[in-house]
């Protein structure tokens, strides 16, 4: 029996699907808390401290942390979604916020390039103009406003200022628009660019809670492991084929 390309493709698809199902069988949880630098703008914005997630936090520079090793600082994406500080929630990782409030289309609001570009630098400890020290709360204020701007939360907090528009005194927002060339370009979907993703939170009853930002490092290990599993499975099929000849 010969193995056609069609059968090889099916084998790879089945193995990949099995790996995905196995990884999603156990619900992941995290705890999200406020800290002394939260709510810098009086509108309930970040940063917030996320702990117990089990996520790889190696992309976060120590200077960006408030809660210490194993935690990371995040910001909210949807102005009209909420969470209870100190609570533990289930989460999934995606490139878009579920529901998404102001910028959602079809119940999904992809992270924008402007948001991804800024947050990745914040996490890396390299965001120009961000005060990681005593002035952190003020910096958080303007960074959170920039995220809400790029995620099209404007209808929710229209008229808020200063700092909620290009040329309105928000250095982070202005830098992102300048880097990408226009507001429209900075609001384009990131699709995982800069390693930035969304943590979509739900409570024990499945109710949506405030979606949060997360940045990861490229994981070559998982890709190679899946490829190895696929190749091992293919080798097994080939051996079985030879026995049946």
What feature does the model see in each segment?
Residues 2-12:
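Bacterial N-terminal signal peptides that target proteins for export
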Residues 4-5, 20, 225:
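Serine/threonine-rich, low-complexity intrinsically disordered segments
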Residues 13-22:
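Bacterial N-terminal signal peptides
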Residues 23-27:
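Sec/Tat signal peptide C-region and signal peptidase I cleavage site
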Residues 28-215:
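Short, surface-exposed polybasic-aromatic patches that bind anionic ligands, especially phosphate groups
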Residues 219-238:
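A short, hydrophobic C-terminal helix/tail in secreted or cell-surface proteins
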Residues 241-245:
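Short, charged juxtamembrane terminal tails flanking transmembrane helices
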């Amino acid at each position: 029996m010969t193995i056609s390309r069609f059968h090889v493709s099916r084998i790879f698809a089945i193995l990949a699907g099995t790996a995905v199902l196995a990884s999603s069988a156990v619900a992941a949880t995290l705890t999200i808390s406020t800290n002394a630098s939260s709510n810098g703008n009086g509108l309930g914005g970040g940063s917030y401290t996320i702990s117990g997630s089990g996520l790889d936090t190696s992309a976060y520079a120590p200077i960006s942390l408030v809660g210490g090793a194993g935690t990371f600082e995040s910001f909210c994406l949807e102005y009209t979604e909420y969470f209870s500080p100190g609570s533990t929630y289930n989460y999934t990782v995606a490139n878009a916020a579920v529901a998404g409030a102001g910028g959602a289309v079809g119940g999904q609001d992809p992270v924008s390039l402007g948001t991804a570009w800024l947050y990745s630098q914040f996490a890396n400890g390299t965001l120009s103009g961000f005060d990681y020290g005593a002035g952190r709360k003020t910096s958080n204020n303007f960074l959170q406003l920039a995220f809400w701007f790029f995620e099209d939360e404007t209808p929710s907090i229209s008229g808020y200022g200063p700092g909620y528009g290009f040329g309105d005194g928000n250095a982070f927002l202005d830098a992102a628009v300048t880097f990408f060339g226009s507001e429209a370009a900075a609001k384009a979907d990131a699709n995982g660019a800069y390693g930035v993703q969304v943590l979509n939170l739900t409570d024990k009853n499945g109710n949506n809670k405030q979606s949060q930002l997360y940045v990861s490092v490229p994981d070559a290990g998982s890709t190679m492991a899946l490829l190895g599993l696929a190749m091992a499975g293919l080798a097994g099929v080939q051996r079985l084929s030879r026995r049946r000849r």
